[in-house]
């Protein structure tokens, strides 16, 4: 490629793009770690995007109506960091660029949400960014429908690489976006034909443009190093009536004489000698991390070009009726709906009196019927299991082309994209997403669920059919290890409610959470209401509490969750009949219990006596409460699952696997 000809054709563009490239090269070299090739290859596309098309104001990084820019190919993080520094984001200082990938740095190896303003989402696991962006596009459409396009009218731009498009989640996401006709979503494909193993063709022959077209997208192409051709394609993309893929043909490591267009430049520093040659090829005579003042000033002018449009937008916002403005600002700031607590309180009181015997998945539906009318920002959904997850209430309609006021997503059999899209909805602002599937299929959503926890995104995962209690569908659908997996994930609340009251309390906590996602593990089988005396306080917020106290001298404590709390209470009755004083502790959320002060934990689980945990899942998460926290191994037992389940009616399964009142009582007596 003739670099001199490109430099001569668009000299102003060349200087701006070269500033990105050299910052990326220098930061990776200084860190002795990173990925310079992608920023070098996509600098031209990014320059045209930020200079001519992206709506943003670097001095107001959280402006509600800004365009969102998602770097799905997160390994190329220095592309984003260089842009944020050059355009004048306050937190993106040159010192931070120099501190790339170091302890305490805002500029982490892969972009991390919450570390640096301008980073819209955490990326790095390939395919997550493009899928999260689909959720952002859905949220934009929802907010525009509710508040009007004078307040909400922006695009979601994504840079994705070959690896993003190979990941299975990408097909789920592009299929969902195509079905929803999300014309506010534009994906810029860094088509450099290189992976770590070599040419893309060593592992893939997919016609990506045909794949996107078949999924309902418009497809455009450009020379990713020709500023005028890039501008033409991006201008056309903004006018499309469907989501757009722009095929940007690029060279990875553009300008490196010996490493461009090879995997050698993907994930390692260029080295001093190659950097010298590359600078010469660019015509860049400045030292490491030196950006001439006139180039920095031009970039900062680009960063300020949205200020006037933002001021006009703020005037429109200020002119709204006070109530509408306050509600818009609350939803964008992700504030808790003011009527939520009252709705939950009234629901609990009514259900304590009615004492229904319902599955907790049905209880969840009942809670949502009370909550959705007073929390207008909820958008629910299911991965093709609406009738089983019971996630749709009668007051909400489907979100679809032509009805963006709808608050229910038909995700199809796309668990992973559903989870990522929900992350994107919350990150955009204005939406509280929840979505359902069978608990066993958290396996299909795991990558995005982990990012919920890592980012501090309070997505609500409605996971029904939570144990062998689902019955005849058998071990392929019966979760036994999944509670342990969710509980092992940092910054996750895993709720397994025992009845309709605990279900309501779990929902209140999930919809009030600021920075922690929630998993609601809900039963298929009917469970009785255990708390028939109304308690205004949210007992689930403590994580665990005494649901039945020992009569006489306490000799044993039974700990249980979900459907097994009822079984534990029946075991208590057997033990009490033999004068064995037994306390039953319901533990709907281990994480919240662990967060309580030691005095409370000691009050619920005092030292001495036998402890038995009961749960139709594996033992692994329970040893903290059985062996630790004042427990003793010789006095500790577990009644639950040791392996996978089986296909049979639920009642038979509980009997065959020994999760019965009689087995629990026998376990206690064997430990006395």
UniProtKB/Swiss-Prot annotation:
<feature type="binding site">
    <location>
        <position position="388"/>
    </location>
    <ligand>
        <name>substrate</name>
    </ligand>
</feature>
<comment type="function">
    <text>Catalyzes the transfer of a two-carbon ketol group from a ketose donor to an aldose acceptor, via a covalent intermediate with the cofactor thiamine pyrophosphate.</text>
</comment>
<feature type="binding site">
    <location>
        <position position="465"/>
    </location>
    <ligand>
        <name>substrate</name>
    </ligand>
</feature>
<feature type="binding site">
    <location>
        <position position="524"/>
    </location>
    <ligand>
        <name>substrate</name>
    </ligand>
</feature>
<dbReference type="InterPro" id="IPR020826">
    <property type="entry name" value="Transketolase_BS"/>
</dbReference>
<feature type="binding site">
    <location>
        <begin position="124"/>
        <end position="126"/>
    </location>
    <ligand>
        <name>thiamine diphosphate</name>
    </ligand>
</feature>
<dbReference type="InterPro" id="IPR033247">
    <property type="entry name" value="Transketolase_fam"/>
</dbReference>
<dbReference type="InterPro" id="IPR005478">
    <property type="entry name" value="Transketolase_bac-like"/>
</dbReference>
<comment type="subunit">
    <text>Homodimer.</text>
</comment>
<comment type="similarity">
    <text>Belongs to the transketolase family.</text>
</comment>
<keyword id="KW-0479">Metal-binding</keyword>
<dbReference type="GO" id="GO:0005829">
    <property type="term" value="C:cytosol"/>
</dbReference>
<dbReference type="GO" id="GO:0046872">
    <property type="term" value="F:metal ion binding"/>
</dbReference>
<keyword id="KW-0786">Thiamine pyrophosphate</keyword>
<feature type="binding site">
    <location>
        <position position="192"/>
    </location>
    <ligand>
        <name>Mg(2+)</name>
    </ligand>
</feature>
<dbReference type="Pfam" id="PF22613">
    <property type="entry name" value="Transketolase_C_1"/>
</dbReference>
<feature type="binding site">
    <location>
        <position position="192"/>
    </location>
    <ligand>
        <name>thiamine diphosphate</name>
    </ligand>
</feature>
<dbReference type="InterPro" id="IPR009014">
    <property type="entry name" value="Transketo_C/PFOR_II"/>
</dbReference>
<keyword id="KW-0808">Transferase</keyword>
<feature type="binding site">
    <location>
        <position position="266"/>
    </location>
    <ligand>
        <name>thiamine diphosphate</name>
    </ligand>
</feature>
<feature type="active site" description="Proton donor">
    <location>
        <position position="415"/>
    </location>
</feature>
<dbReference type="InterPro" id="IPR055152">
    <property type="entry name" value="Transketolase-like_C_2"/>
</dbReference>
<comment type="pathway">
    <text>Carbohydrate biosynthesis; Calvin cycle.</text>
</comment>
<feature type="binding site">
    <location>
        <position position="473"/>
    </location>
    <ligand>
        <name>substrate</name>
    </ligand>
</feature>
<dbReference type="InterPro" id="IPR049557">
    <property type="entry name" value="Transketolase_CS"/>
</dbReference>
<feature type="binding site">
    <location>
        <position position="162"/>
    </location>
    <ligand>
        <name>Mg(2+)</name>
    </ligand>
</feature>
<feature type="binding site">
    <location>
        <position position="266"/>
    </location>
    <ligand>
        <name>substrate</name>
    </ligand>
</feature>
<dbReference type="InterPro" id="IPR005475">
    <property type="entry name" value="Transketolase-like_Pyr-bd"/>
</dbReference>
<feature type="site" description="Important for catalytic activity">
    <location>
        <position position="35"/>
    </location>
</feature>
<keyword id="KW-0106">Calcium</keyword>
<feature type="binding site">
    <location>
        <position position="441"/>
    </location>
    <ligand>
        <name>thiamine diphosphate</name>
    </ligand>
</feature>
<dbReference type="GO" id="GO:0006098">
    <property type="term" value="P:pentose-phosphate shunt"/>
</dbReference>
<comment type="pathway">
    <text>Carbohydrate degradation; pentose phosphate pathway.</text>
</comment>
<dbReference type="Pfam" id="PF02779">
    <property type="entry name" value="Transket_pyr"/>
</dbReference>
<feature type="binding site">
    <location>
        <position position="194"/>
    </location>
    <ligand>
        <name>Mg(2+)</name>
    </ligand>
</feature>
<dbReference type="InterPro" id="IPR005474">
    <property type="entry name" value="Transketolase_N"/>
</dbReference>
<feature type="binding site">
    <location>
        <position position="75"/>
    </location>
    <ligand>
        <name>thiamine diphosphate</name>
    </ligand>
</feature>
<feature type="binding site">
    <location>
        <position position="35"/>
    </location>
    <ligand>
        <name>substrate</name>
    </ligand>
</feature>
<dbReference type="InterPro" id="IPR029061">
    <property type="entry name" value="THDP-binding"/>
</dbReference>
<feature type="site" description="Important for catalytic activity">
    <location>
        <position position="266"/>
    </location>
</feature>
<feature type="binding site">
    <location>
        <position position="361"/>
    </location>
    <ligand>
        <name>substrate</name>
    </ligand>
</feature>
<dbReference type="GO" id="GO:0004802">
    <property type="term" value="F:transketolase activity"/>
</dbReference>
């Amino acid at each position: 490629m003739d670099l001199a000809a490109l430099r001569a054709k668009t000299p102003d563009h060349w200087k701006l793009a070269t500033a990105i490239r050299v910052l990326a090269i220098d930061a990776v070299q200084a860190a002795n770690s990173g990925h310079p090739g992608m920023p070098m290859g996509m600098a031209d596309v990014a320059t045209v995007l930020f200079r001519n098309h992206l709506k943003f104001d670097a001095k107001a990084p959280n402006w509600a109506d800004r365009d969102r820019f998602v770097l799905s190919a997160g390994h190329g993080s220095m592309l984003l960091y260089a842009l944020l520094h050059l355009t004048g984001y306050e937190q993106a200082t040159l010192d931070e660029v120099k501190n790339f990938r170091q302890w305490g740095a805002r500029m982490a190896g892969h972009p991390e949400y919450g570390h640096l303003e301008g980073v819209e989402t955490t990326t790095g696991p390939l395919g997550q960014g493009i899928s999260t962006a689909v959720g952002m596009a859905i949220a934009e459409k929802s907010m525009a429908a509710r508040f009007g396009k004078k307040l909400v009218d922006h695009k979601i731009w994504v840079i994705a690489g070959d690896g993003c498009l190979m990941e299975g989640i990408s097909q789920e996401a592009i299929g969902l976006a195509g079905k929803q006709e999300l014309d506010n979503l534009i994906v810029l494909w860094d088509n450099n034909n290189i992976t770590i193993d070599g040419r893309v063709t060593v592992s893939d022959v997919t016609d990506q443009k045909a794949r996107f077209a078949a999924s309902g997208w418009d497809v455009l192409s450009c020379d990713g190093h020709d500023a005028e051709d890039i501008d033409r394609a991006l201008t056309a993309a903004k006018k499309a009536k469907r989501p757009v893929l722009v095929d940007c043909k690029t060279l990875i490591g553009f300008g490196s004489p010996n490493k461009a267009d090879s995997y050698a430049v993907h994930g390692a520093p260029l080295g001093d000698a190659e950097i010298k040659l590359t600078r010469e090829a660019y015509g860049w005579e400045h030292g490491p991390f030196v950006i001439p003042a006139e180039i920095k000033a031009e970039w900062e002018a680009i960063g300020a070009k949205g200020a006037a449009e933002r001021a006009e937008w703020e005037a429109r916002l200020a002119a709204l009726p006070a109530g509408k403005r306050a509600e818009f600002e609350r939803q964008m700031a992700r504030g808790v709906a003011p009527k939520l607590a009252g709705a939950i309180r009234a629901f609990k009181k009514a259900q304590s009196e009615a004492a229904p015997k319902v599955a907790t998945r049905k209880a969840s539906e009942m809670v949502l019927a009370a909550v959705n009318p007073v929390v207008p920002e909820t958008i629910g959904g299911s991965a093709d299991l609406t009738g089983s997850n019971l996630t749709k209430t009668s007051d909400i309609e489907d979100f679809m082309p032509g009805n963006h006021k709808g608050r229910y997503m038909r995700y199809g059999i796309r668990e992973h994209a559903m989870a990522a899209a929900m992350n994107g909805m919350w990150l955009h602002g204005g939406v509280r997403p929840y979505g359902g599937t069978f608990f066993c299929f958290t396996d299909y959503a795991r990558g995005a669920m982990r990012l919920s926890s890592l980012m501090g995104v309070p997505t609500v995962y409605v996971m029904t059919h939570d144990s062998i209690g689902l019955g005849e569908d058998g071990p392929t659908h019966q979760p036994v290890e999944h509670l342990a997996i969710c509980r092992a994930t940092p910054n996750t609340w895993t709720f397994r409610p025992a009845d309709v009251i605990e279900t309501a309390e779990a929902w209140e906590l999930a919809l009030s959470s600021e920075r922690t996602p929630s998993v609601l593990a809900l039963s298929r089988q009917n469970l009785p209401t255990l708390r028939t005396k109304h308690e205004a306080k949210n007992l689930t917020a403590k994580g665990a509490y005494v649901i039945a106290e020992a009569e006489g001298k306490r000799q044993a404590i039974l700990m249980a969750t979900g459907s097994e709390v009822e079984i534990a209470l029946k075991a208590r009755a057997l033990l009490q009949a033999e004068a064995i004083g037994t306390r039953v502790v319901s533990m709907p959320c281990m994480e919240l219990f662990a967060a309580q002060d030691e005095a409370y934990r000691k009050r619920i689980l005092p030292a001495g006596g036998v402890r038995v945990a009961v749960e139709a899942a594996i033992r692994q998460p329970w040893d903290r409460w059985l062996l630790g926290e004042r427990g003793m191994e010789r006095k500790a037992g577990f009644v639950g699952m040791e392996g996978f389940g089986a296909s049979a009616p639920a009642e038979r399964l509980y009997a065959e696997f020994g999760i019965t009142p009689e087995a629990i009582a026998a376990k206690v007596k064997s430990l006395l």
